[in-house]
Amino acid sequence: MNYSKRTAGALRVIGGKYRSRLLRVSARPGLRPTPDRVRETLFNWLGQDLSGLACLDLFAGSGALGFEAASRGAMRVVMVEKDRAAAAQLERNRAALDATQVTIVRGDAAAFLARDYERPGARPSGRFDVVFLDPPFRQNAVPAMLGKLPPRLQPNARVYVESDVPVEVAAPWAELE
């Protein structure tokens, strides 16, 4: 598949409260919504019930992973997206689902990790149990993001990484699958 082409249309939430609901996807260069099969495998690994967990979707793009987490009961989902049009589409999808546990942050992922954008009433620590790290391909952003994540993670947090190049996993990280 040529990921450099624009992707537009819709994708479906595959499980949980919002199952079968459509998420509109903006036509943006490099936007790669995570395919159904990959999301299904990922959420089989994470578990179907994410109740009580805080999730961070860096480089949210279509929001497929963050909305899937919200659908499966995550108490808080923060989606960070730099692209103005993609972030606006995330807001429209959040409103259409009435996903009040989802917060959209339009901004740079590295800046988000460096500052505290948390909304009032969120966990004071601003830490996350699950992080989805799926930056645009050919940006080699994964190593830098992994270096900035530890202060924002709960003990035993899980980080899902999607990359177009192999990622070296070094301490304090452990590769699970």
Q: Which positions does each model-derived feature cover?
A:
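Class I S-adenosyl-L-methionine-dependent methyltransferase catalytic core
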Residues: M1-E177
